[in-house]
Amino acid sequence: KAQTKIENNNYGIRKNLLEYDRVNNEQREIIYEERRRVLDGESMRDVVYKMITDTVEKNVDALIGDDQGKDEWDYSAINHSLRPIIPVELITPERIKGNKKDELKHQLKQEAVKLYEAKEAEFPNPEMLRELERVFLLKVIDRKWMDHIDDMDQLRQGIGLQAYAQRDPVVEYKMSGYDMFESMTDSIQEETVK
């Protein structure tokens, strides 16, 4: 009877480990696919454009509610959040055309893309910038991925405590791992855009 109990317990542990590995493998495949695209020499121009617009979207969405009017926006927070990443002009009520969040996002995206295009124009050969983008993006992905692996390992070591709180450790690992992965990809975007 004791042996059966121990075997069942060990089976449960192995099953959980397989689930943890499945989460890690899914994330690994996504990152390796991104790395492959960079290493295959694809132009990263469209990727960087998307990163720029996504960064504007996320920062504005995080700070402005859909129902807030221009007079309710926290301009200091918007500037503090966005300008260290994308050096757009100081964001003030007078400078913003329109009164809606979507109009602000559109204006800031246009400004950010113009800044990128101005940087692009500084290079006599656009392929030089493409190569720099590939090298930089690869370094950022690799560094952030290594940090993420360490963080996921720490999460796995501490996740067993969730069982004491009557939570399924596998579900908690998946949810926390997903949040951490999203945070890592956001961080990759922001650092690349800078």
Named regions from a protein language model:
Residues 1-194:
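Extended, charged helical/alpha-beta scaffold domains that provide interaction surfaces
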